Amino acid sequence: MDGFIVVDKSAGMTSHDVVSAVRRIAGQKKVGHTGTLDPFATGVLPVALGEATKAIPFLDESIKEYRAVMKLGVATDTQDYTGKVLHESDWSHVTTSALNEICRMFVGKLSQVPPMFSALKQNGVPLYKLARQGAEVPRQPREIEIYSLVIEAVNLPEVAFTVRCSRGTYVRTLANDIGGKLGCGAHLLQLHRSLSGPFSINNAITLDDWARRMQDGRAGETLVSPFAALSHLKDFILTGKGAAKVANGVVPALEDFQVLSECELLRDELVRMSFGGTLLAVAKAGLPGDWKMLKNLKLSRVFNLDNSFT
C-alpha cells in the first residue's frame, strides 16, 4: 500500500509505537510518521506507507490545531500532568475576563523557549534525557506563531481552549506561560491534535478500526494519496509519453504536458507532476519565470506509483 493513514492516536502510545503498529498491521516495512505527539496526547498522527514516505519532506504541515485542557494553580516540570509538581499557587483571583485578556496577548508571532522535556537535542543528546538526569540547560527561544487562541470552556481551575498555531509550537509551554502571566502557574491535562497541515481528525481512524478494515480488505479506502497530500503544490499534468519519461528520471519537454496553467514559478518552487490523478514526481524550478520555462525544472523526487502509461 502507498499512502498516508491519518491515525487517531490514543493516549499512552508513543509515535514510535504507532509506526510499529501500522507496520505490523500492514505487513510492510516502509513506514514512517511525519511528526510526533507526546505519549499523553491524542489525535492526528499522519503515517506514511510505501512510496508515500518519499512525500514526507514536501508536506506542508505549517499549520496545526489542538484542543486542550489546562489546570491552573499547579506547575510541573514536564508542563503536563505526567510531571513532578514544582509549585502550587492560589488561582482564585482568576476571572474569565482575565483569561481572555491574557490569551489575546499570546496571539501573533512569539518567541517560545522549548521545554526541557522535549526531543530537541543538545550536543546530540535529547533534552528529555538530560532533564531526567536532573539537568537544566539553556535553550534558545524559537519563533512561533499563534494564529488563534480561543477559550472554549471555563470550569476553574480547569480551562478548555482551542489553538491554531505554527509547526514547532509546544502547547504544553503555551499553557505554562499563560499560567505564568496569570500569576498562578498551569499545566496541561489533555491535548488533542485535530489538524496537521492537510490531515484532519475528520479523516482519522483508530488503529483498531484500521486493523479491522485490513482484515476486510478495505484498509486502502482510508488512505490519503501522496497526490492529495501535496495539494498545496501547483500541478503539471503529463501525457502518457511524458509520464513514461518522468518514471525513468527524465525531465519532460513542453510537449509532454497535457495541461499547463498560466502561472509564475519562483526560484526553488516545488511543483507536482502527475498523470491520471497519480503523483509521479516533485520537481523544483531552478530559475524564476513563467510556466513555459520548463527546461529549468529539475526532478527532486520520482514516485513509483503507476507504470500503466497510455
From Swiss-Prot:
Pfam families according to UniProt: TruB_C_2, TruB_N
EC code: 5.4.99.25
Key words, A-Z: Isomerase, tRNA processing
Gene3D superfamilies reported in the protein's UniProt record: Pseudouridine synthase (3.30.2350.10)
One GO BP annotation of this record: tRNA pseudouridine synthesis
Record-level Gene Ontology MF annotations: RNA binding; tRNA pseudouridine(55) synthase activity
UniProt-listed CDD domains: PseudoU_synth_EcTruB
InterPro entries: PsdUridine_synth_cat_dom_sf, PsdUridine_synth_N, tRNA_psdUridine_synth_TruB, TruB_C
Database matches in SUPFAM superfamilies: Pseudouridine synthase
N-terminal signal peptide: none
Annotated catalysed reactions: uridine(55) in tRNA = pseudouridine(55) in tRNA
EC supergroup of this enzyme: isomerase
Active site: 38
Role, per record: Responsible for synthesis of pseudouridine from uracil-55 in the psi GC loop of transfer RNAs.
Family: Belongs to the pseudouridine synthase TruB family. Type 1 subfamily.
Protein's name in the database: tRNA pseudouridine synthase B
